[in-house]
Amino acid sequence: MQSSQLRRLLYYKAFGYRYVSAEILSGGERFFKALDALKSATAECNLCELAKTRAGSGEQNFKNFKTIKNFKNSKTPANVKLMIVALAPGANDGFGGSLEAEIEAALDQICAPEEIYFSFLIRCAVPQNRRVSSEMILKCAPYLTDEIKILKPKVVLCLGELCCKIVLRNGDLAGIDALHGSVFNEGGISFVPSFDPAFIAQNPSKAELFKEDLQKIKELL
């Protein structure tokens, strides 16, 4: 089985599928050797239904959201130590939503802003009345996979249970309450799951656990 087919199969498994036809797995290999090429492809992406609802090009839509630190000006650090990945950008909130300032302050304690890179599993905002679908994940996740390969960060912080399971390609992992703070090593990169900011906003007691996860990341850096 080709690597691209295996990757797709693992994504479907993470979604809970037990059977996937060969036709579904027949999508072509997509591999970007440079970040500029990946961003250009993202800007013109029409692979899923979200392309019909976004305003402007995909990459511009990706840049327009209010986010913290270097992601606001969309500059890519020359030496990425920490890559932070959330499920999808919010149409109105920033990367950290109402907790943006608090997350920013916590990150200041573990890593220099110019060494942090922010990204999303799904590049376009998902309308509030629409659930994340397997199609969105399958079409968009390869962009992130290649982005990680290009940037080669020391640590990838995955925010939220679904995002963690897709990035780690393992739907059998425990829930985020048990999963957070664990360290998974692959290809010389440490992957650390933690809570999504929106989840923390609804469950304030998780904020301290999130900060503890960040301290664990500091040790890995």
Where is each model-derived feature located?
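A polyanion-binding, active-site-adjacent surface
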Residues: 2-221
